[in-house]
UniProtKB/Swiss-Prot annotation:
Function according to Swiss-Prot or TrEMBL: This is one of the proteins that bind and probably mediate the attachment of the 5S RNA into the large ribosomal subunit, where it forms part of the central protuberance.
GO MF annotation list: 5S rRNA binding; structural constituent of ribosome
InterPro entries, per the entry: Ribosomal_uL18_bac-type, Ribosomal_uL18_bac/euk
Native species: Afipia carboxidovorans (strain ATCC 49405 / DSM 1227 / KCTC 32145 / OM5)
Stretches of the chain forming a coiled coil according to its record: none
Family from the record: Belongs to the universal ribosomal protein uL18 family.
Pfam families: Ribosomal_L18p (PF00861)
Protein name from the UniProt record: Large ribosomal subunit protein uL18
Gene: rplR
Length: 120
């Protein structure tokens, strides 16, 4: 395994351990990004169910002409996810960046979710 993959795997483990300690029963906002799209979901780990989700693959996003590979799409996904989560009664979450650096698309999604009503 390359040194970069080992470093990324260790970072992901550290993030998960810290989240478990800090969660305090709050749902987790999990982010996954690929080279072409970005996905986010609010997960209740105690019940094992997804409370809200959004991605750049959704029809409303594609009709808007936004690809998932840029910051604008990440902002739109964050806003959409926050609206759905607030509608389902979730206002406080723990942000799970999934080992990704808090920069670029991940940061844009988090900022948009905060602006739309989620607190973390």
């Amino acid at each position: 395994m390359s040194k970069l993959k080992i470093t990324n795997a260790r970072r992901k483990q550290r993030v998960r351990i810290a989240l478990r300690r800090a969660a305090g029963g709050r749902p987790r906002l999990s982010v996954f990004r690929s080279s072409k799209h970005i996905y986010a979901q609010v997960i209740d780990d105690q019940k094992g169910e997804t409370l809200a989700s959004a991605s750049s693959l959704e029809k409303t996003m594609r009709e808007g002409g936004k690809t998932g590979a840029n910051i604008d799409a990440a902002k739109a996904v964050g806003k959409l996810l926050a609206e759905r989560a607030v509608k389902n009664g979730v206002k406080e979450v723990v942000f799970d960046r999934g080992g990704y650096l808090y920069h670029g698309r991940v940061k844009a999604l988090a900022d948009a979710a905060r602006e739309s009503g989620l607190s973390f």
